[in-house]
Amino acid sequence: SQYSSVDAIKRIIPADRKNTLIAVMINCGDYDAELLPQYDGTGPDCIRVCFHKAQALQAVELCRKIKEKGYKVYFQPMVALSYSDAEYLGLIGMANKFRPDGFYIVDSHGSMKQKDVARFFYLIENNLDKEIAVGFHSHNNLQLSYSNAQYLAALHTEHNLIIDSSIMGMGRGAGNLNTELFVEYLNETAGADYSTEPILCSIDNTI
């Protein structure tokens, strides 16, 4: 793990975080929720629980414990393509019961085509409680992160939509969706008003 404790994360969070929500990921089975301090607003705000298919029940219990400590929690079943429709609906049913703040479509191997994204989004849109946000976490092995994100952003949905990205697509393996590309797309097509200059400066200064 990059950070073994909340205290280690607190040391790198700016004193003035403004309106930024700080999120971290936990791999189910790698961290004991009993070690997690009560949320106090000085560390991470959101915890994303990543898990494999065989860990679903364990992940639900971990999410419950995290919620009880006051954090926002996101349910992140890895390798979405490994689930049948019935299995994925089962996950959605679990989420509706314990009510995470978000439920993620995860393209762990970067192998999802648009039809795959559409399939999982359809299952979520028609079955997940509308108060639960929908997230999309992609990897760019087939260079489809950008087009898949465009597809999702164009859909009409009652859910809040979260699309993960990173500067220059930094991420494991083939990387993720490029923030600098996607915010420009949103500015041009969705009426967004993101400033790209700070993003490009971050790339120049840190990469």
For every predicted segment, state its role.
Residues 1-207:
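Catalytic cores and adjacent flexible loops of soluble metabolic enzymes
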